[in-house]
Amino acid sequence: MLKTPFSRRAAVLMAILAAVAGAALWLQRPDPSRIHIFKGVRGPQAASRIAPTPPATIAEFDRGSDHRLAILVTDPNSGWLGLVRGFRAHGVPVTVTQDPAKALRHRVVLVYPIVSGRVLSGEQIRGLAEHVRGGGTVLAFNLAGGGLEELFGVQAGAELQTRERLRWTASSGVAEEDEIVVSSRGETRIPSIGYANMSARGLATFEDGSTAAACRTVVGQACVLGVDLGALAQRAMNGRAEVISRNYANGYEPSLDVLFRWVRDLYVAGEPTPWIVSTVPAGKEVSILLSHDVDFTRSVENSAAYAEVLKTRGLKGTFFVQTKYVRDYNDEVFFDDRTVPMIKRLVADGMDVGSHTVAHSDAFERMSLGTGKERYPRYRPFVDTLTTVKGATILGELRVSKFLLEDLTGARVTSFRPGRLSYPFDLPQALVATGYRHSSSISANIVLTHLPFQLTDSRGDAALKPVFEFPVTIEDEAAPRLGDRFDAANVVIEKIARHGGVATVLIHPNVTDHKLRFEERLIDHWSGRAWMGSIADFGAWWAARDALETDVVQENGQLALRAASPQALRDVTIQFPKSGRVERLDLPAGGRAAIPLG
């Protein structure tokens, strides 16, 4: 059959396309001078999928006995989820409801975010007043109406976004607790109400002299707090409060903790049988998480010395390993056949091996999410400069590094820390999609708390994710050298220990002199007083503690503590502040306990 001009052109076009495709495949081949190839290693094969998470609802938290702290939500579009996250971190049992009658069955009631005739009926507002006169406690954040000013002893002032500092009238002896930060510029502008004190007991003021917190005793207590605590908690825990913080790292920044502890103390004072779930394992004052960022050529080999320090003291630590199999602007290849046995030794020694990405790029926070099908060795991120990278995605950084560490070293990778603490908004859902459960991606000073907390979808205000953040407290890159600021670090940890907090220590094992001595001294100094170990081990403890359900109920004519634990639980204590009683819980997964309180 004769070829027509059209068929000849088509044949030529097909040949050109085939040549282009062949050239593309050739260009995509691994370059052995830049990329280390592990023979026979390909993966991960399964795709990672971002599953949509429905928004958290008030109904999910509308449960529990009347002995809990009640949060009466008068606007469901407010920051109420921030209150839930904060109180759970602090171990305060809460019931969240939109039903005033149900809330008023509790002795201590938070009305959030507003008290006003626009959101509560006259009868409901009178119910709040009667609750106080009957011996209960009511805390209002925005007392905007309803004729309760005389009861609370204050007169509402202007709502502003320019107040940045709150100072307590009674000193704690700790400067960072006596004056806290509550707002700043840009996205972190948190509205506040400056009250005029008429007959209340003033407890705190803003920098403009207006009253920030006050209580008036009328049989019970009527209190106000002029800070939108829910909104502040959401901004801070979502990593959107950087300009509020007084330090980036290596400091004590308890601003959020101080406010939650103040409300906790109102609950303890006003509830006849209050209880608190401990924030630290039984018998310890503080938790110190020992972590190491392995992101430099010599760091892999040096990690053995750090692991030996831990092992000889019966401890475990976390080693966040960069799976650097591409030579680029940052460094030479150091995740290869020579170093994999060193990482396997860490695993054999019981260390927690976590991911520190593939590229370790400052651009991580600006990367696209990716397809969830990124696979080694085709996934080849290339860092051009300090701030730019080619061929990298968030999912690729997470899934490929996790796959390589697990496949080549036998590690079970559940912990993640990004290079340079670069923190994309899509990270929480990407972590879930790729199988992580513990994140250490931001500094404690930025989030204004020294406790772990649960992450939310897109670092937003709606949906909770099953991943907890363990923010960095002490890091080794600021001046002076880490080994020269041992005393300064201990001052910070001592302040955290006063309240049973968590201190996460970040060390780069690029050297083994002053940094290694720092870790040895730290462990020896806190031996006996602190729980010390890996992020994975503490993360599992914290997640089980967070899932624990506790209640005080009437049982056979007397009060009893009921506990139910979906996960295996050890060394969690329940504190009863008024009696001084402490109950330790050790439960199997699905275990329950009923303890008479007398």
Question: Which stretches of residues belong to each language-model region?
Answer:
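Helical hinge/lid and interdomain linker segments adjacent to catalytic or ligand-binding clefts
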Residues: 70-150, 319
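Catalytic grooves of carbohydrate-active enzymes
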Residues: 292-294, 412, 467-540
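Surface beta-strand/loop "capping" patches
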Residues: 538-576
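His/Asp/Glu-enriched short active-site or ligand-binding loop at hydrolase and phosphoryl-transfer sites
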Residues: 432-461, 469-479, 532-542
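A glycine-centered loop/beta-turn motif at secondary-structure junctions
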Residues: 66-69, 84-90, 137, 191-274, ...
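A glycine-rich, often tryptophan-bearing local segment used as a flexible ligand/cofactor-contacting loop or short
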Residues: 118-185, 192, 197, 205-207
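N-terminal Sec-pathway targeting helices
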Residues: 1-17
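Metal-dependent polysaccharide deacetylase catalytic core of the NodB/CE4 family, i.e.
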Residues: 147, 287, 300, 311-426, ...
